[in-house]
UniProtKB/Swiss-Prot annotation:
Protein name: DNA-directed RNA polymerase subunit beta
MF terms (GO), sorted A to Z: DNA binding; DNA-directed RNA polymerase activity; ribonucleoside binding
Class of enzymatic activity (EC top level): transferase
GO cellular component, one term: DNA-directed RNA polymerase complex
This protein's encoding gene: rpoB
GO BP terms, alphabetized: DNA-templated transcription
Length: 1373
């Protein structure tokens, strides 16, 4: 068999990869995890369990919901519907087709259900199976995730944002002294389940403990304890210890000496040893823990206390008469002086009392005695009355309600996470499968709450990431599914009871619409299902990695306090402390850190390198915030020697609570993987982030997401090394699916013959259709360009095509431009930006924006609307761009008001005049009974038509344009099929040739003689089909040929079948909305050049608006004549403290000067003045070891590499581990520049040098989405507000500009009374004045008069609503 590796003539594509000079010192042991894996794992792996066999599916996600809802039985238990398995069919349309046809990308869910019918004997009650029916039931279309982690819903791309919410479990906290005037801390506990009722326990100001369910009226906690079955005695014995007082004749009582009960208190009486009678300490003295320990060690067992000491203590068991066994006082009662006398009289020798002291307060006992409920029944009825006020309370109903509240798995679910948290907080050992409350839980929650009040333990920190978890897509949709299936369950039970069960099939019982509507509602309207931010690839990735605290079950903006929004020590390595929106959502919407991932319980984990005996290993361990608290963790920049040992006497480590300690190297457990793990993806793209102020870094990371993809992309000279990862994971670029060789390339597609052979040894073919000028969600342009050439050898996951905002496989949001920091005639006042005309002329910051316009031809009451060129009362000039069908041509240049699609609508009949009758008789009916309802280009839009899509309803005849588009599409499908077949045929026939050459012919086509030996020349004379007719002597060869033919035929048949399916789908017509006959979509591309008013920004939060475009000859220039592109204001730096931009500028200056140096060396090499060794030496000096792979290649390739860096050398300065100031100076020296990075600059207008040296360098600038074209508009005639009669505001309403209070002051200051009057009356809301002014303009006059503004009338009406009748009285002067 021929090996495909034989004919790899190509050089690997990896040779084209960009090499950056990296300033990082820390060796990376862990790769950045896939940036959108959070979305894909959650939905595809955990929820759908898509490509997993039914038998291997775990009980989670969809599987667990179906298992929990089914089996469903009817009320009489005769019918039983069980779940067997589920599977997904293939989606009807692929992702691209769904977005084009405005459909949802979804797959039909087929669930196999088994209906068992039972026969029940009425006398004996025995059951036996009567019949079993199993059937596959369609349960609706379930949205699928695209390969980029998004959903296509109704044709638009949406993202489901992960939600941060409080983890289920029990939480203890206090009110910080806010409730009670004395500042006393009132402690409380809250049990938060994943699903079910909340349980709160709280102390009041009198130290009585209450509980409430779902924030209803509060009850005594002992009512709850009685409701779970505890008696008074059990309650007291569980929460209190007991001590026995023994009577010592004529001396008092002897009691066991327990040091902790009396330490740190002044003695009220002498401390006497009961056994010896010795006085150990006098009254009034303080007993210290050391003294107590000493006495205990010396054998002090019992101490003597005075007789009346018992007064005020509480009984720990019933006090009984020794003679009659009569109960004298109940357990828990306080011993009074009277009771003590009774004890003396009856000569009771032993009295058991509760241990109550400052370490153990009487709260439970006090609550017990305040509570009127004395038994379980009364307690349950009391709870019932609070939860169901107005309903009669009986014990069965109360019992059932209480059980359903906390102990029923159907209605209450703590979830596995909640159980784990509960066990760890209460120190219990209950199985993780028990996800309801237990009696032990409730008893121990009260115990811990009382201990907190007694000063033992600490309260929980709600903002700790161990107490907040992430609900990702899969879990959010799982919850919706559960709601839908619970609703469906009710309808199934109803149908079971209603129909004849014997004849019914499973599909008759299931109504899938209920489930579908719930899922649809979630994707369309939920606060967490959002329209994807698709401005550029970075904004897509960030949106998918966003964590929101808002949404259903989360916080609300208005009630979220400062603590929730603040950065917490546990955010380190998990949530980015920088990237969050400015404004009211600050801190509520966060971004996951670069290396963070979410574990199976929903907690965010961060990676660390394990340290063993002071030696750093390469083992990477992911820890959650809870686990991290147990260890000492060093920083990534801790000094490590060659053997991997931590250097230095002490290492700075993080410990629980966010504190830092200095420990010896052998005590360190872990160190950070990299300093970059602290920040998010957007922040990790900012070079010199460590030199920027945090507020500006926040703006920088937010503004990168608003950068518009430009026509010409340009990766930053000064990057951070993460650019490639972002481009790859965003899905903007095209990745090779398999190793292979490029067979064909054009701007629309790439064909690759793969090197992974099939079972039959034949190659498979990958065809990548590139996206050309597609519209994104934010009207930016998605366009992919191939990076490979024919013959290139590509490896799996190599980038073979660039997408929007990517350059050679790296993210490129802006352009490198030459900037100078200097004031220029006041044009860069307040962050304004001055740009050179070259930038506009050479389209440096030009971007393409695509607008979509849609017209629908509907079936109306009066008849169908029609797409046509035949429009009444429209000139031929207006129709010049339309084809014969009435749809605009592709490539037409259009401006506001032009017709895109001609459409006429039937109009109702109106009475006809005799003249009209005559005209109709002469010219026919048609022209009069329709009105023009064509699609026009809206105001403010102009550009080129780049695409037209026509969709026709099934059964409606297609027009010429639709047929032409269809034909074009079929040709494309056919080309894909033919190219694939050609590659397979080439392989098959060259294999056949190898087998046949040298064989002896037995039989064959006419051209060949029997007995002849086959040669290559002979085979060249035969057609491909005749190869199969040859029969040779060797039976083994014939067998092999037979196998090849079978495989070839199968392959060909499969290709034809796939082609036929695609064509059939294309020709079958479209599913259009109700009443629509035809839909035409027109896409117009507009080129936006940079102009004054556009917003630009750097990566460091330095933003500004363009103030002026200056001719090149007027701009400042360098001594070699290079003109500066952009002039920025140096005053924008000191107060903003984003110094990173200056370091970036200096390093950029080194970059272009090093590139010039390399170009000079290449020139000298070509002129044979120097050899290749000098170039190699300079490259090693510049790049270090990074460059070795290139230096080993032939000379031409080294020169070709040098040419690639001729515009600028690319640097990588990783966040917190990048170039220091000295490194920048070294680079400037290597480039032959002054280490200050400043140069002499010449003024373009005068030709003279500026007085001082100026900072000049290459800087990376972005053009943001806030374009002046989309902001400014002018109003001529437009709508007025109904009440005030003033023009509306805003571009969308075609509004006017408000002449506000300050503008009035300006006119007053100038004394321009008439102008002011005109502004406030006729130009605003004087209705009569407006009409008169219009009349006078029409008559060509210049005079007008103002009347009363409408707003004055509104004010009078407002007065009248207050019952004040205000009139305007005009008296003649």
């Amino acid at each position: 068999m021929v090996s495909l590796r034989d004919n790899i003539e190509a050089q690997p594509l990896s040779h084209n990869r960009r090499i950056r000079k990296n300033f990082g010192h820390i060796n990376l042991v862990a790769d950045i995890p896939n940036l959108i894996e959070i979305q894909k794992n959650s939905y595809e792996k955990n929820f759908l369990q898509l490509n997993i066999k039914d038998s291997e599916r775990k009980n989670k996600g969809l599987q667990s919901i179906l298992n929990s809802i089914f089996p469903i039985s009817d009320s009489s238990n005769i019918a039983n519907l069980e779940f067997v398995k589920y599977e997904f069919d293939t989606p009807k349309y692929d992702v691209e087709e769904c977005s084009q046809r405005s459909l949802s990308y979804a797959a039909p869910l087929k669930v196999t259900l088994r209906l068992s019918i039972w026969d029940i004997d009425e006398d004996t009650g025995t059951r036996e199976i009567k019949g079993i029916k199993e059937q596959e039931v369609y349960m609706g279309d379930i949205p699928l995730m695209t390969k980029n982690g998004t959903f296509i819903i109704n044709g638009t791309e949406r993202v489901v944002v992960s939600q941060m919410h409080r983890s289920p479990g029990v939480f203890f906290y206090h009110d910080e002294g806010k409730v009670h005037s004395s500042g006393k801390l009132l402690y409380s506990a809250r049990v938060i389940p994943y699903r079910g009722s909340w349980l709160d326990l709280e102390f009041d100001a009198k130290d009585v403990i209450y509980f409430r369910i779902d924030r209803k009226r509060k009850l005594y906690t002992t009512t709850l304890l009685r409701a779970i079955g505890m008696s008074t005695e059990e309650i007291i014995k569980f929460y209190y210890n007991s001590v026995t007082y023994k009577l010592v004749k004529n001396k008092g009582w002897a009691v066991k000496f327990i040091p902790q009960h009396i330490t740190a208190h002044r003695l009220t009486s002498d401390l006497v040893d009961a056994d010896t009678g010795n006085i150990l300490l006098k009254a009034g003295q303080k007993i210290t823990p050391r003294l107590a320990k000493k006495y205990s060690g010396e054998g002090l067992n019992n101490i003597l206390v005075a007789h009346e000491t018992l007064i005020g203590k509480y009984l720990s068991e019933d006090l009984r008469d020794p003679a009659s066994d009569e109960v004298l006082a109940k357990i828990g009662e306080m011993i009074t002086a009277d009771m003590l006398n009774v004890i003396n009289d009856l000569k009771i020798k032993n009295v058991n009392v509760l241990v109550i002291n400052p370490q153990s307060g009487p709260y439970i006992r006090n609550t017990l005695f305040a509570d009127k409920n004395q038994d379980r029944e009364a307690a349950l009825c009391d709870i019932f009355r609070v939860l169901r006020p107005g309903e009669p309370a009986n014990i069965e109903a109360a019992e059932s309600l209480f059980y359903n509240l906390f102990f029923d798995t159907e209605r209450y679910d703590l979830s596995e996470v909640g159980r784990i948290k509960m066990n760890s907080r209460l120190e219990l050992n209950i199985s993780e499968e028990v996800t309801v409350l237990t009696i032990d839980d409730i008893k121990n929650i009260v115990r811990v709450l009382v201990e907190l009040k007694d000063g033992k333990g600490i309260i929980d920190d709600i903002d700790h990431l161990g107490n907040r978890r992430v609900r990702s897509v899969g879990e959010l949709i799982e919850n919706q599914f559960r709601i839908g299936l619970v609703r469906m369950e009710k309808s199934v039970i109803e149908r079971m009871s209603a129909g004849d069960v014997d004849t019914v099939m499973p599909h008759d019982l299931v109504n899938s619409k209920i489930l579908v509507s719930v899922v649809k509602e979630f994707f369309s309207t939920s606060q967490l299902s959002q329209f994807m931010d698709q401005t550029n690839p970075l904004s897509e990735i960030t949106h998918k990695r966003r964590l929101s605290a808002l949404g259903p079950g989360g916080l609300s903006r208005d009630r979220a306090g400062f603590e929730v929004r603040d950065v917490h020590p546990t955010h380190y390595g998990r949530i980015c402390p920088i990237e969050t929106p400015e404004g009211q959502n600050i801190g509520l919407i966060n971004s996951m850190a670069t290396y963070a991932r979410i574990n199976k319980h929903g907690f965010i984990e961060s990676p660390y390198r394990r340290v063993k005996d002071g030696c750093v290993t390469d083992e990477v361990v992911y820890l959650s915030a809870i686990e991290e608290g147990k260890y000492k963790i060093g920083q990534a920049n801790s000094k490590i020697n060659k053997d991997g040992k931590l250097q230095g006497e002490f290492i700075n480590c993080r410990v629980e609570g966010g504190n830092f300690v200095m420990v010896e190297p052998y005590e360190v457990d872990f160190i950070d993987v990299t300093p970059m793990q602290v920040v998010s993806v957007a922040a990790s793209l900012i070079p010199f982030l460590e030199n920027d102020d945090a507020n500006r870094a926040l703006m920088g990371s937010n503004m990168q997401r608003q950068a518009v993809p430009l026509i010409k992309t340009d990766a930053p000279f000064v990057g951070t090394g993460v650019e490639g990862v972002v481009a790859k994971d965003s899905g903007a670029s095209v990745l090779a699916l398999h190793d292979g060789i490029v067979e064909q390339v054009d701007s629309n597609r790439i064909v690759i013959r793969t090197l992974e052979q099939k079972v039959d040894g034949s190659p498979s073919v990958d065809i990548y259709n590139l996206l050309k000028f597609q519209k994104s969600n934010h009207n930016t342009c998605i366009n992919q360009k191939p990076l490979v050439k024919v013959g290139h050898y590509v490896k799996k996951n190599d980038i073979i095509a660039d997408g929007p905002s990517t350059d050679n496989g790296e993210i490129a949001l802006g352009r490198n431009v030459l900037v100078a920091f200097l004031p220029w005639n006041g044009y860069n006042f307040e962050d304004s930006i001055l740009i050179s005309e070259r930038i506009v002329k050479e389209d440096v910051f030009t971007s393409i924006h695509i607008e979509e316009f849609e017209v629908i031809a509907r079936d109306t009451r009066l008849g169908p609307e029609e797409i046509t060129r035949d429009i009444p009362n429209v000139s031929e000039e207006a129709l010049r761009h339309l084809d014969e069908v009435g749809i605009i041509y592709i490539g037409a240049e259009v401006k506001a008001g032009d017709i895109l699609v001609g459409k006429v609508t039937p109009k109702s009949e109106s009475p006809i005049t005799p003249e009209e009758k005559l005209l109709r008789a002469i010219f026919g009916e048609k022209a009069f009974d329709v009105k023009d309802s064509s699609l026009h280009v809206p105001s403010g839009v102009s550009g080129t038509v780049v695409e037209v899509r026509v969709f026709s309803r099934r059964g409606v005849e297609k027009d010429q344009r639709a047929i032409a588009i269809e034909k074009q599409q079929i040709e494309k499908f056919a080309k894909d099929r033919d190219d694939e077949l050609e590659i397979i045929e080439h392989f098959v026939f060259s294999w056949l040739e190898k087998l046949l050459v040298g064989q002896v012919i037995i039989n064959g086509p006419k051209q060949v003689k029997v007995g002849q030996t086959i040669t290559t020349e002979m085979l060249k004379g035969l057609s491909k089909g005749q190869f199969w007719q040859i029969i040779v002597e060797d039976a083994n060869v014939m067998n092999e040929i037979e196998q090849i033919k079978t495989h070839y035929d199968e392959k060909k048949e499969a290709l034809d079948k796939r082609f036929a399916t695609k064509v059939e789908k294309l020709q079958s017509g479209d599913d259009l909305p109700q009443g629509a006959l035809k839909v035409v979509k027109v896409f117009i591309a507009t080129k936006h050049k940079l102009q004054p008013g556009d917003k630009m920004a750097g990566r460091h939060g330095n933003k500004g608006v363009i103030s002026r475009i200056v001719p090149e000859e007027d701009m400042p220039f360098l001594e070699d004549g290079t003109v500066v592109d952009i002039v920025l204001n140096p005053l924008g730096l000191p107060s903003r403290m984003n110094i990173g931009q200056i370091l970036e500028t200096h390093l950029g200056w080194a970059s272009i000067n090093l590139a010039k140096k390399i170009s000079t060396l290449v020139k000298e090499y070509k002129n044979k003045h120097i050899g290749i060794e000098q170039i190699k030496k300079f490259l090693i000096e510049l790049y270090g070891e990074n460059i070795n792979s290139i230096l080993e290649r032939p000379e031409e390739e080294i020169i070709s590499f040098c040419k690639k860096v001729s515009k600028g050398v690319h640097f990588a300065t990783p966040v917190f581990d990048g170039a220091k100031v000295q490194d920048v100076k070294d680079m400037l020296k290597l480039a032959g520049q002054d280490p200050s990075g400043q140069v002499k600059l010449i003024d373009g207008r005068t030709g003279e040098y500026f007085d001082r040296l100026v900072t000049v360098g290459q800087k990376y600038l972005l053009k943001l989405h806030h374009l002046v074209d989309n902001k400014i508009h002018s109003r001529s005639i437009g709508p007025y507000s109904l009440v005030t009669q003033q023009p509306l505001g805003g571009k969308s309403h075609f509004g006017g500009q408000r002449f506000g209070e300050m503008e009035c002051w300006a006119l007053q200051a100038y004394g321009a009374a008439y102008t002011l009057q005109e502004m406030l009356t006729v130009k605003s809301d004087d209705v009569n004045g407006r009409i008169k002014t219009y009349d006078s303009i029409v008559r060509g006059e210049n005079n007008f008069e103002s009347g009363i503004p409408e707003s004055f009338n509104v004010m009078i009406k407002e007065f009248r609503s207050l019952c004040l009748n205000v009139k305007l009285e005009v008296t003649s002067s």
